[in-house]
Amino acid sequence: MVMFATGLLATQAVAQSARVVNVYNWSDYIDPKVIEDFTSETGIKVQYDTFDANETLETKLLAGKSGYDVVVPTAYFLERQVKAGVFQKLDKSKLKNLGNVWPDIAKRLAVYDPGNQYAVNYMWGTTGIGYNVKAMRERLGPTGTIDSWDIVFKPENLAKFRDCGVHMLDSADDIVPAALHFLGLNPNSNDPKDLEKAAELLEKIRPSVRKFHSSEYLNALAAGEICLVVGWSGDIKQSQKRALEAKNGVEIDYSIPKEGAQMFFDNLSIPKDASHVDEAHAFVDYLLRPEVAAKNSNLVAYANGNLASQKFIDKAVLDDKGIYPDAATMDRLYTVSARDQKSQRFVNRLWTKIKTGR
């Protein structure tokens, strides 16, 4: 009996000493080796789950007791969530690598998180057009190019790609602002009349869109199952890389339209009710190491907010203007702010109608 009790106490002690961090991140958004190396170095086990829509993350956060210690919200959702009180302030004394952040990116992020108190940038990117080069040339001619939103938002143009498969992000917060911008309206407009104009435009092109999804297009584009997508820069670049690795003859390219596109920021935050706060800070700090940030960018093909990492980033990635846009392109990028709840509900209803036709 004494031996059993002693064994039980020992088991409990081991369980209590086991360290873990529960992470909720976007799909295809980290080098798995980074997780392995973090655990090997720190002894902290990483429980890693993924999502492919900000709404999924937000639902869990607002409900409380999400069970996660580190999450990765996009900035315009972060802004609203900070106001809702779902995050705790970062303990910057535990983030020794915070000095590696890119000041310009931190400044842009501060628009959503004043003082950068609740988040630090993980990755950033753009929302543009990914396409199959062969399919594009077959439809637009040997000298054809995709460099304008005209190809998406003019129904007669998008219809040319209907037969080979068009996908679009299932994200009203990406697609509606793009439609507003194309119409010459403020991409951040909450005016119902503006939003209805954007919805009318999207309803006109809806017949040519095979599917709305925020992650399936990565593999579908690489496999040649679809030929055009409005998607996120890094995902399309990953698709390009996978097609090359598969040697399947599919050539993928990515365009940031000349009219401009959305620039987004995905960020590391710690929920207020996180159970493993020290481990969460340790994980965030590890991701802020220059060589670690570079390893992630090299694999996922997204730019990161870590200036010190650039000397470790593959030249092909750093020189790719679809990943790290040049200054002229950066000047044409716009950002999206959080909508108030009433406007967000209105946009969500419009989005459902656009997708379903009802």
Label the model's feature ranges.
Residues 9-15:
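Sec/Tat signal peptide C-region and signal peptidase I cleavage site
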Residues 16-81:
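Early extracytoplasmic/lumenal segment of secretory-pathway proteins
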Residues 17, 79-126, 145, 150-153:
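Hinge/lid segment of periplasmic solute-binding proteins
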Residues 82-90, 107-109, 114-116, 208, ...:
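Ligand-binding "clamshell"
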Residues 88-99, 150, 246-262, 271-274:
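Short beta-strand->loop
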Residues 160, 167-255:
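Ligand-binding pocket segment of bilobal, Venus flytrap-like solute-binding proteins
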Residues 219, 327-358:
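Conserved C-terminal helix/tail region of periplasmic/extracytoplasmic solute-binding proteins
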Residues 266, 271-332:
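Mature extracytoplasmic/periplasmic domains
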